[in-house]
Amino acid sequence: MATIKEIKELLVTVKELESPIFLELEKDNRSGVQKEISKRKRAIQAELDENLRLESMLSYEKELYKQGLTLIAGIDEVGRGPLAGPVVAAAVILPKNCKIKGLNDSKKIPKKKHLEIFQAVQDQALSIGIGIIDNQVIDQVNIYEATKLAMQEAISQLSPQPEHLLIDAMKLDLPISQTSIIKGDANSLSIAAASIVAKVTRDELMKEYDQQFSGYDFATNAGYGTAKHLEGLTKLGVTPIHRTSFEPVKSLVLGKKES
């Protein structure tokens, strides 16, 4: 009779719920064996569910594949709402039918998994472009226009250049066919890939700024208006990376000028 350890090793090789190996092993009454069978079945079901989820997020890409297009870039941005730091956009071209386990809208990925999935995108993408527009430009042109500039910069870095753009809720004035998708980072794997690249890139930048400008908790809040950030603004004032067109930074700058 096989040991439970041997059965556990055998079960790792089983990839289908209908496998005859399960039927054979289920005759073994040992509780340890039954526990390992249940565990392996749950793992297989989880893999099937994940594959279905990833398939559903390729629906836009597959429609474009049918048209003979393969160089499809997903575009997304991070950092529209913060009081400090740049807006960062990423453009990512994934290989045809590429599925990266765990890839999703970056807001839905556990923080501890960000770097792992970011690295998987880096490893598998055909091309990645990143656009970074700083707070000074944001203050000059407004955040919406700055976001478009960041996206255009990211796209310009792609090589090869894309045949079609899938963009999260935006249209760009570019001579490339494009589809604007509401909640694109949750509905397109290409956009989700851009989402995690932009997110990790910006988070790392804000960690660097945290070293330069201590007291605002940038490493944790990424420039968003948390209690610690607002406390830092009140005590220490405005830094060179703050967006002076955003409240309450704007009022602090005006108050300083008037005093």
UniProtKB/Swiss-Prot annotation:
Q: How is the cofactor bound?
A: Manganese or magnesium. Binds 1 divalent metal ion per monomer in the absence of substrate. May bind a second metal ion after substrate binding.
A single GO CC term for this protein reads: ribonuclease H2 complex
Its required cofactor(s), as named, are: Mn(2+); Mg(2+)
Matching entries from InterPro entries are given as: RNase_HII, RNase_HII/HIII, RNase_HII/HIII_dom, RNaseH-like_sf, RNaseH_sf
Where the record annotates domain RNase H type-2, the positions are 70-258
Compartments it resides in: Cytoplasm
The record's catalysed reaction(s) read:
Endonucleolytic cleavage to 5'-phosphomonoester
Task: Indicate which residues the UniProt annotation says bind a divalent metal cation.
Answer: 76-77, 168
Q: What is its EC number?
A: 3.1.26.4
One Pfam annotation reads RNase_HII
Q: Report the family membership.
A: Belongs to the RNase HII family.
Q: What is this protein called?
A: Ribonuclease HII
User: What species is this protein from?
Assistant: Streptococcus pneumoniae (strain P1031)
